[in-house]
A protein has these predicted regions:
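Short, low-complexity disordered leader/linker segments with a strong preference
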Residues: 1-39, 364
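Early extracytoplasmic/lumenal segment of secretory-pathway proteins
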Residues: 30-100
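Periplasmic-binding protein-like
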Residues: 209, 214-218, 257-281
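Mature extracytoplasmic/periplasmic domains
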Residues: 270-271, 275-339
Length: 364
């Protein structure tokens, strides 16, 4: 009897060891299998920072390379200009994501390989522009506003209107993004989206001509049209500008050196963006790309993404790792209400015409 008890005890110990080894090794999906591969990203600035990419490289034994784009038009141009055979993962904004799906430039994502998807904000997952035929083509990553950014050491009273850009006191001290989104801004000043947010993205010829006139009038005030967030950071750091349209990345980066930039929502409103991660249709690394997407939407990694960018992140659970001040600063503590203040970019059906107007403004 004692011997049988010993045999039974030994079997129990061996079973326990096997269970422990299995638990430590994780699920099959978690196992690194991609040694030596390279994953190529085509993203906005800040979306491939070593602070969170390095962890992925180490976990899966791979290398991540990144190419940045400065506008949605540049992203589409790169993809259509041969980039479809170069890049694996891209980060389009909400103004072109649906177009990429419709044009067949991206592949559906197997959400079984992206278990963290279930933890993303429902409001972001419920948007239909990246869904087709019951399949999902884009996973929400970050979101944010196109705010009015100002140097609070120079402008003591927070601006309440975009009209401050035309104030003669700030001639040569304003910066705009080199992008058609400036037309959206003028559309908001014209009150076009009071009852219909999509009106900014479907302006009539007469409305576009009016926007062009306003933007040409603004040109003497403009120090420079910035092409990248880094360029706008430099303009503020060098005190070349005191007002700009920009993203939360800029006050976060510039204020780290002791400056005092702030951002506000003017009374006319603001536009904003939702950035998704998508997989290029011809990517040879789709499985690795899905692992990457799952990794960077993990709640702990999303906290690091917020640290780096200052942007809102898609995984609300990231707030568990933030101070109340950080959660408030990126509006993750009140995401649904804050999002109601933003007119998020939509696809511009006649994008060529918008680009034509913007190019005419710059050529004047």
């Amino acid at each position: 009897m004692k011997k049988r008890k010993s045999v039974g005890l030994l079997a129990t110990i061996i079973l326990g060891l096997l269970m422990t080894m299995t638990a430590c090794s994780g699920t099959t999906a978690d196992k690194p299998k991609s040694d030596g591969k390279t994953l190529n990203l085509l993203t906005w600035e800040g979306y491939a920072d070593p602070k969170f990419v390095k962890g992925f490289e180490e976990k899966y034994g791979v290398k991540v390379t990144v190419t940045y784009f400065g506008s949605s038009d540049e992203l589409v141009s790169k993809l259509k200009g041969g980039g479809g055979n170069v890049y694996d993962v891209i980060s389009p904004s909400s103004d072109v994501a649906g177009y990429l799906v419709r044009e067949g430039l991206v592949a559906p994502i197997n959400l079984n390989n992206v278990p963290n998807y279930k933890n993303l904000a429902e409001k972001l997952k419920n948007m239909n522009d990246v869904k087709k035929g019951g399949k999902v083509y884009g996973v929400p990553f970050t979101w944010g506003p196109d705010s009015l950014i100002y140097d609070a050491d120079v402008i003591k009273t927070p601006p309440n209107s975009w009209k401050i850009f035309w104030d003669p006191k700030y001639k040569g001290k304003v910066s705009l993004w080199d992008d058609i989104s400036n037309i959206y801004l003028i559309g908001q000043m014209m009150g076009l989206d009071k009852n219909d947010p999509s009106a900014l993205y479907n302006m009539s010829d007469a409305q576009l001509q009016e926007a062009k006139k306003k933007l040409i009038e603004l040109k003497p005030q403009v120090r420079k049209y910035w092409a990248t967030a880094g360029e706008l950071n430099d303009l503020f750091s060098n005190k070349e500008v005191v007002l700009a349209v920009g993203w939360p990345l800029t006050p976060k980066a510039v204020n780290a050196s002791g400056r005092n930039l702030k951002e506000v929502i003017p009374k006319e409103g603001i536009t904003g963006w939702i950035d998704r991660l998508m997989i290029v249709k011809s990517s040879p690394n789709k499985e690795l790309a899905e692992k990457y997407i799952n990794y960077v939407i993990d709640e702990k990694v999303q906290k690091i993404v917020a640290d780096v960018t200052g942007y809102g992140v898609a995984n609300k659970n990231a707030a568990k790792y933030m101070t109340p001040e950080q959660a408030k600063s990126i509006h993750i503590d009140d995401m649904d209400n804050y999002m109601k203040k933003i007119n998020f970019w939509q696809e511009v059906k006649d994008r060529d015409k918008y680009n034509e107007i913007w190019n005419e403004v710059k050529a004047q």
